[in-house]
A protein has these predicted regions:
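Conserved, well-structured core segments that form or line functional sites
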Residues: 1-130
Length: 130
């Protein structure tokens, strides 16, 4: 469950959200997966590395335009990438969850593609709400 304070941070500051996620436990479907140890912020239309750079809106990145607290999952080079959408609806910014520290020190979560494979995350999570 997310606190009201964290939800407010998500809606106002993507970089602060990326920092605040560090050390948090990532749970999917009620199952704890590990502690978030690496994130990367994508700052929307002004960020040339972001899928919504220059206000580019496509069916593939549509989940980025949902309200803060939704997942944006996309595939690149055969790997799924897990992003947490930030900002209010129609303002496309997100934080990529890059790595987890698992309870057993599992090394298969030490990169964004390895993390999603370890967690069993696929495109079906795209657009889902926390």
């Amino acid at each position: 469950m997310l606190s009201k304070k964290f939800k407010q941070v998500m809606e106002t500051d993507t970089i602060a959200t990326a920092k605040a996620l560090l050390g948090m436990q990532l749970c999917l479907d009620g199952k704890p997966l590990g502690r978030i140890v690496e994130t990367e912020a994508y700052l929307g239309s002004k960020d040339s590395a972001c899928h919504s750079a220059n206000d580019r809106r496509t069916p593939k990145n549509e989940a980025m335009y949902l309200a803060a607290g939704h997942w944006y999952v996309y595939q690149i080079y055969g790997h799924q990438m897990l992003n947490l959408v930030t900002k209010p609806q129609n303002v496309a910014e997100a934080v990529l969850i890059r790595a987890l520290e698992t309870a057993d020190g599992h090394l298969l979560a030490n990169g964004p593609g390895k993390l999603t494979k370890f967690a069993g995350i696929d495109k079906s999570y795209n657009g889902d709400s926390l």
